[in-house]
Amino acid sequence: MGSPIEIARSYPEIGRAKVSMSPLRTLLLAILAGMFIALAGVGATFGNVYGNKIVGAAVFPAGLAMVIIAGSELFTGNCLLIIPALEKAITVRQMLRNWALVYAGNLIGAVLIAAMTVGGGTFDGVYDTVIATAAAKAALPLPAALLRGILCNILVCLAVWMAMAAKNVTGKIAGLYFPIFLFVLCGFEHCVANMFYLPAGIFAAARCGVSAENLTVYTMCIGNLLPVTLGNIIGGCAVGLVYRTVYLREK
């Protein structure tokens, strides 16, 4: 099992590896991550409908497990690239370029799953839940969306950090499970998950002929994804800054 200082020391090399990948490879891996998180969102939706919020929260960690174990690029986890950037292993420009490409890929993957599941009738009988979930997210006040985004990515980056401490699949799943369970249970906001939930709500409303005035591309992007993404960046970078200060900064 890797210690926290060993994980911190590994991040400069991890950062170099991530930014050295070709744009196509990065984009494809990011699309996969968006799909994995979206599929977890599908499962969590049914967990909420047929069980309760705890069941939905218990299912959702499958998304990050697929991201880490199968291998893909997730925007929220890549906020930890602040560590190699501060260590000058990569440039800020390289970090921002990675974030932009991964964000775009995550969006493509998540929207693809939203379109396929709604179009394929996966949510038959539970469209009201899909629409209500999206509408609630779109109606969040901007400060609430920002703060929930910060709290969410503190937990997500801790989940990534804890998974890196393990050397086997079982340990990685155990490490990431509880932080992800907590963020879903607490109702915090994850931009990549919302790239699924919000389009799914829009598609479901259109499929059912339901009028949902606050479910538009504008409210999705400006009302939710923008503040949640900013919050996720702040929360993720805060985790990276603390661990970099504690373990890598020269005394």
Residue ranges and their predicted role:
Residues M1-K251:
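Alpha-helical transmembrane segments and their helix-helix packing motifs
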